[in-house]
Structure formats: structure tokens, C-alpha cells
Amino acid sequence: MTKATFAAGCFWSVELLFQRVAGVTKTRVGYTNGTVENPTYRQVCSGKTGCAEAVELEYDPEKVTYNQLLGLFWSKHDPTTLNRQGNDVGTQYRSGIYYHNEEQKNEAIASKEKEQLKYKDPISTEILPAGVFYPAETEHQQYLGNY
């Protein structure tokens, strides 16, 4: 299995999107690329941790490619809005692709360049190495999938 990590607003709906993909074998929501170890949801929502709400997933590259996952990521949100998706506002809702290897990095950069052609405004999505991923509290895991 291969890991991928994406941030595209509230992690509940992002997780649900990827849970429905054939070839994705595991998802978990959490916090990444911040400055606080083991942050809580409340701390992340304060905007003082630097963390993004993100989804870390495991997938079978024989069944779904990283490029296909990137396509879903881009389709899920407006990557031109900085630190905002819909009514959710704050740095924790930023758009991000957090790569786990050089191949993912290169594919992410290429997909961002291709995606930019669709927009007048610049894409604000950050592409960074995957940092430490802190799983969110149990009540946030598979939140929308449970309803």
C-alpha cells in the first residue's frame, strides 16, 4: 500500500470523497504541517497551531493511481481561495498536497500546473513534504460515513 495526504477544507467531506474510491484501503483524518505536537481539534480551530485539517490515505496503486487521486482532490474544492473553503475560514482549511516521495512531488507539481490553466486566479495550494500526521479525535474519524 502507498500513502497520500491531502488538505482541501473540512476533513470530513474530503475523507468521504476518498473513502468511496475503489483502491483506497484506509483513510484517517487529522492534522499536519503545523508547529504543535498532538494538537486537539479545538487547538487547530484556534488558528494557533499552523496545522492543516488533512486526510491521510492508503491506496493500492494497481487499482487507483496517484494522478487519479490528484484529479479527485482538485475536483473537491476551489484551490484559488486561500485558507478558505465555502463557509469554513482559517489556515486549518488551506489547500495542500503533502507528498511522501519524489514521484508524488513531481506528479503534484505537474497536476497543479495543468489545473492552473482552468483558473484566472492563482492556485494557492501548497505542495510540501508530508510532515508528522496527528490523527484527529475518534469522533472525527469516518464522521460523514457514519451518517
From Swiss-Prot:
One GO MF term: L-methionine-(S)-S-oxide reductase activity
Family: Belongs to the MsrA Met sulfoxide reductase family.
Keyword Signal: yes
Catalytically driven reaction(s): L-methionyl-[protein] + [thioredoxin]-disulfide + H2O = L-methionyl-(S)-S-oxide-[protein] + [thioredoxin]-dithiol; [thioredoxin]-disulfide + L-methionine + H2O = L-methionine (S)-S-oxide + [thioredoxin]-dithiol
Signal peptide stretch: 1-23
Any single Pfam family the record assigns to this protein: PMSR
GO biological process terms held by the UniProt record: cellular response to oxidative stress
Listed NCBIfam families: msrA
Role noted for this protein: Has an important function as a repair enzyme for proteins that have been inactivated by oxidation. Catalyzes the reversible oxidation-reduction of methionine sulfoxide in proteins to methionine.
EC number annotated for this UniProt entry: 1.8.4.11
Keywords of the record: Oxidoreductase, Signal
InterPro entries to which the protein is assigned, alphabetical: Met_Sox_Rdtase_MsrA_dom, Met_Sox_Rdtase_MsrA_sf, MsrA_MetSO_reductase
Species assigned in the record: Dictyostelium discoideum
EC class (word): oxidoreductase
Listed name of the protein: Peptide methionine sulfoxide reductase
Database matches in SUPFAM superfamilies: Peptide methionine sulfoxide reductase
One GO cellular component term: cytoplasm
